Amino acid sequence: MTQKRRNCGRNKHGRGHTKFVRCINCSRAVPKDKAIKRWNIRNMVETAAIRDLSEASVYSEYAIPKIYVKLQYCVSCAIHARVVRVRSREGRRIRTPPPRVRYNRDGKRVNPAAIAKTAL
């Protein structure tokens, strides 16, 4: 039978069984190696309250702690929420991650490769 993906959509190679995790969107049980995982990193304090907190703080330089939340989706919810996209047959073979979109302070897109060339 034909195979759609080289890894069968999993990261299990050689293991017989992996534990299940729950999708954060629909609570579906998904094998841990198949779930689409993303980290959400943000400040514990919302942006509006950061200045108030720094003014009230005794310390001059206080690093506000961050919250690290691991988001785990099932395949259908990840596609629906556009965390991952459906790719063509040729596109599925590309294993390198897509280039990250970066913005400068003005809100304009920045190409890191072009900046590296101009810096030299």
From Swiss-Prot:
- Print the keywords alphabetically: Cytoplasm, Ribonucleoprotein, Ribosomal protein
What are the start and end residues of every segment in region (Disordered)?
88-108
| Sequence intervals crossing the membrane | none
- Give GO terms for biological process: cytoplasmic translation; ribosome biogenesis
Q: Does the keyword Metal-binding apply?
A: no
* Single GO molecular function: structural constituent of ribosome
In terms of PROSITE patterns, this protein maps to: RIBOSOMAL_S26E
Enumerate the subcellular locations listed in this protein's record, separating them with semicolons.
Cytoplasm
Q: For this UniProt entry, what's an example GO CC term?
A: cytosol
Known Gene3D superfamilies for this protein? Ribosomal protein S26e
Q: Which domain of life is it from?
A: Eukaryota
User: Quaternary state and partners of this protein?
Assistant: Component of the small ribosomal subunit (SSU). Mature yeast ribosomes consist of a small (40S) and a large (60S) subunit. The 40S small subunit contains 1 molecule of ribosomal RNA (18S rRNA) and at least 33 different proteins. The large 60S subunit contains 3 rRNA molecules (25S, 5.8S and 5S rRNA) and at least 46 different proteins. eS26 interacts with eS1 forming part of the mRNA exit tunnel. eS26 interacts with TSR2.
Describe the task this protein carries out: Component of the ribosome, a large ribonucleoprotein complex responsible for the synthesis of proteins in the cell. The small ribosomal subunit (SSU) binds messenger RNAs (mRNAs) and translates the encoded message by selecting cognate aminoacyl-transfer RNA (tRNA) molecules. The large subunit (LSU) contains the ribosomal catalytic site termed the peptidyl transferase center (PTC), which catalyzes the formation of peptide bonds, thereby polymerizing the amino acids delivered by tRNAs into a polypeptide chain.
The UniProt family comment states: Belongs to the eukaryotic ribosomal protein eS26 family.
Q: Please tell me what else the database record remarks about this protein.
A: There are 2 genes for eS26 in S.pombe.
Q: What is this protein called?
A: Small ribosomal subunit protein eS26A
Originating organism: Schizosaccharomyces pombe (strain 972 / ATCC 24843)
Which gene codes for it? rps2601
